[in-house]
Structure formats: structure tokens, C-alpha cells
């Protein structure tokens, strides 16, 4: 049976662009990267995190002041992989706008909230989910205790990040993340994860999710 990821990559369309040196072909994602658009799709794990971080650093080197647009459709994933993306978003100089298409769950919702203030968007039918980190550990009792303490430390840190970006109190975030909390786009806006729900682009020529 063929690897579904390999099958998917084989179906990625190519775009042909006319230049003064003739035709040049790009896969669609590389062409959109030229427009400073990054796609964060699928589970958040080390491989995907490395690619997103590399794209952020590349676009900063290209132009340290021009906005970067990040389109998010992710069920979440590995906390440390997500934090690598988060820290890079805060570290680089260009403002990063975020736009949720489909879903932003778990670490996906944190990265959605991590966009530049007033530049965090959601499409109207997107779903956002927040919750506390989870993990399963095996081994000696002492090791399990150490892992349990580490996940509590991560929980506290993630809560603090949500507090910083949403404007909610720590208690409100702690209560909201106690269980899976599913939000509509409007609810996510009211909660402070996004700034605006958009259903169309104000300027058709603009590559990123800019609105009037």
C-alpha cells in the first residue's frame, strides 16, 4: 500500500510562471512562499515544525519588515514542536498574521493566538479547540513522577501563553483548558484567540489575509 503522504505530494499542483529568462515551474506551496504565505497543516510534529521554522527564518532574511501570513489547519500535536514554532514567531522581526482554515486544535489554537495583535483571523466555519496537554508514561515510579511534574510545568507555561495573547485571566484560562473546549470562530474571537472573523478578502490583489 502506498504511503498516503507520498500520494498527496505527488498530487501537489505545479504553477508555471513567465520570467524574462523563460518559464519557471514551482509547486504551489513554493509559489505561495514567494508571496510570504506559510501553510501549517496537519499534525504538529518535529518534521513539520522544522519546515515552518525554516520558512519563517528565510522570509525574515528576505525582508525583515514585511508581513508573513500563516494559514493554519491543524489538529495539534507535540507540545515542544509547537513551542519551537511559537518561539520563532515571537523571535523574528516581521509581524506574523495567522488565519484559521478548517480547524486549529490544541497546539494549533495556541499558534493561531500567537499571531501579531490585530492580525489574527478565522474563516467563519473554522473550529477552534483548546485543552490542557496530555501524555502517557511508562517505566519506574520515580520516572513517572518526573514526567508528571514536567507535564504540569508545561501546562502552566501554556496557560501563561494563552493569558498573554488572549487577555483572559489565568483562572479563566485554567478553567477553559481543563477539558476539551470547542469554539466557533465567533466564540474564539470573543475569547481572544482571534481578532476578527472574515469571510472575504477586502483587496483581491493582496496575497495575505488582509482585511479592511
From Swiss-Prot:
<dbReference type="GO" id="GO:0051117">
    <property type="term" value="F:ATPase binding"/>
</dbReference>
<dbReference type="InterPro" id="IPR023562">
    <property type="entry name" value="ClpP/TepA"/>
</dbReference>
<dbReference type="Pfam" id="PF00574">
    <property type="entry name" value="CLP_protease"/>
</dbReference>
<dbReference type="GO" id="GO:0006515">
    <property type="term" value="P:protein quality control for misfolded or incompletely synthesized proteins"/>
</dbReference>
<keyword id="KW-0378">Hydrolase</keyword>
<keyword id="KW-0963">Cytoplasm</keyword>
<dbReference type="InterPro" id="IPR033135">
    <property type="entry name" value="ClpP_His_AS"/>
</dbReference>
<feature type="active site" description="Nucleophile">
    <location>
        <position position="106"/>
    </location>
</feature>
<dbReference type="GO" id="GO:0005737">
    <property type="term" value="C:cytoplasm"/>
</dbReference>
<keyword id="KW-0645">Protease</keyword>
<keyword id="KW-0720">Serine protease</keyword>
<dbReference type="InterPro" id="IPR029045">
    <property type="entry name" value="ClpP/crotonase-like_dom_sf"/>
</dbReference>
<dbReference type="GO" id="GO:0009368">
    <property type="term" value="C:endopeptidase Clp complex"/>
</dbReference>
<dbReference type="GO" id="GO:0004252">
    <property type="term" value="F:serine-type endopeptidase activity"/>
</dbReference>
<comment type="function">
    <text>Cleaves peptides in various proteins in a process that requires ATP hydrolysis. Has a chymotrypsin-like activity. Plays a major role in the degradation of misfolded proteins.</text>
</comment>
<dbReference type="InterPro" id="IPR001907">
    <property type="entry name" value="ClpP"/>
</dbReference>
<comment type="similarity">
    <text>Belongs to the peptidase S14 family.</text>
</comment>
<dbReference type="GO" id="GO:0004176">
    <property type="term" value="F:ATP-dependent peptidase activity"/>
</dbReference>
<comment type="subunit">
    <text>Fourteen ClpP subunits assemble into 2 heptameric rings which stack back to back to give a disk-like structure with a central cavity, resembling the structure of eukaryotic proteasomes.</text>
</comment>
<protein>
    <recommendedName>
        <fullName>ATP-dependent Clp protease proteolytic subunit</fullName>
        <ecNumber>3.4.21.92</ecNumber>
    </recommendedName>
</protein>
<feature type="active site">
    <location>
        <position position="131"/>
    </location>
</feature>
Amino acid at each position: 500500500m502506498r504511503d498516503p503522504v507520498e500520494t498527496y505530494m505527488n498530487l501537489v499542483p505545479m504553477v508555471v510562471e513567465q520570467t524574462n529568462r523563460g518559464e519557471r515551474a514551482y509547486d504551489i506551496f513554493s509559489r505561495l512562499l514567494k508571496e510570504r504565505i506559510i501553510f501549517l497543516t496537519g499534525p504538529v510534529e518535529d518534521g513539520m515544525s522544522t519546515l515552518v521554522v525554516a520558512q519563517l527564518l528565510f522570509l525574515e532574511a528576505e525582508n525583515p519588515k514585511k508581513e508573513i501570513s500563516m494559514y493554519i489547519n491543524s489538529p495539534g500535536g507535540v507540545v515542544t514542536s509547537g513551542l519551537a514554532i511559537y518561539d520563532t514567531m515571537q523571535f523574528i522581526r516581521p509581524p506574523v498574521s495567522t488565519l484559521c482554515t478548517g480547524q486549529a486544535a490544541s497546539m494549533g489554537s495556541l499558534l493561531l493566538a500567537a499571531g501579531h495583535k490585530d492580525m489574527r483571523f478565522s474563516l467563519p466555519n473554522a473550529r477552534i479547540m483548546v485543552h490542557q496537554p496530555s501524555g502517557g508514561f511508562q517505566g519506574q515510579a520515580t520516572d513517572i513522577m518526573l514526567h508528571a511534574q514536567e507535564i504540569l510545568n508545561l501546562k502552566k507555561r501554556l496557560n501563561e501563553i494563552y493569558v498573554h495573547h488572549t487577555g483572559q485571566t489565568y483562572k479563566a484560562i485554567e478553567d477553559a483548558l481543563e477539558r476539551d473546549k470547542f469554539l466557533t470562530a465567533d466564540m474564539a474571537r470573543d475569547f481572544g484567540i482571534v481578532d476578527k472573523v472574515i469571510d472575504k478578502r477586502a483587496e483581491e490583489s493582496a496575497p495575505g489575509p488582509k482585511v479592511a
